[in-house]
Amino acid sequence: MTSFPRQELAKALSEASGPSKRPTQGQHAFTRITVQDSSATVECYNGVMRCASVVNAIVGSGIDILVHAEMLQSAIENTKAESVEITPEPNRIKLKVGSRVASVPTLPVADNWTERQERRALTRIQVSNHDAFVPILKIAHGIAKLSKFDDRKHVEITPENGHIRVACSNGYQTLWAKCDCITKGSGTTAVPVEAIDEMLKAASSSMLIRVFDNAIAYNSGSLSLESSIRADSKLVTPMIPRVMESHRKPDSPSAIVDRIELINAIKSADSVSQKRAIPSVKVEIDIAKTVVSCDNSETSVTSDVPADTIGATSFRFAASDIVG
């Protein structure tokens, strides 16, 4: 019998179970739990992505099991019990969670598990500005996941001297952003949106990204992730500077505004926008201000945001992905 702190085990299962929710074969719906000394590794792999998380303060004997991830997660939820007792049996484990007793199926590890292969990283990125990087990653993820084309369902990361470029496009929206990082290596990597999903679940102040010849690895807090890289991705990063240059004109209308004030104005307008047949927000660049507005025939909202402006213009855009 081996005893786990319930909340820590639930957290590790939540962080690591992403691949088990996208199984490509039957055994990929299972998670491997390995206990050695007083810590355990919870790991899931689906042939494309691998996630692992660590649980400490384990009491009892060492175990190595491949257990159904969703059933295990369900068995330890919605209880005030502080510990989970696991006893391995042939083809299953017995669980005791407070007064609750359950049985969860297992598979033989030797026949149904692929070990991680050690390899040398071509690129290393140490994120030094977590507060700036995570919002950029969230916006990029929101844009990329809306693409109707598989070859664009990714976020591109390009290390440069002292920072990284983050870029993506879904054919309608395009993002190109920069964030300070400690970098080593070069080249653009297309990270699948599924991997970005998992990265955002465990984005801590300590974030390390490593790129291999055909995979990307990510470490943050207690989570370790490794994902294959899309080989057939359509890269937008090399095209963006040329596209921006071709559309940029001297003294074209522009505005410098306070980010928080602008976001609050967009959120107010977007709440009204959702009742329009085609949700959109109107932005007007005027003298010393930017006006954000929307009406839906029932409600109208207008916000003036002080700005340092050049020229005047107006345009409409869908705001949900920016403020979401």
Predicted regions and their residues:
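Structural preference for solvent-exposed beta-strand-turn elements
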Residues: 1-324
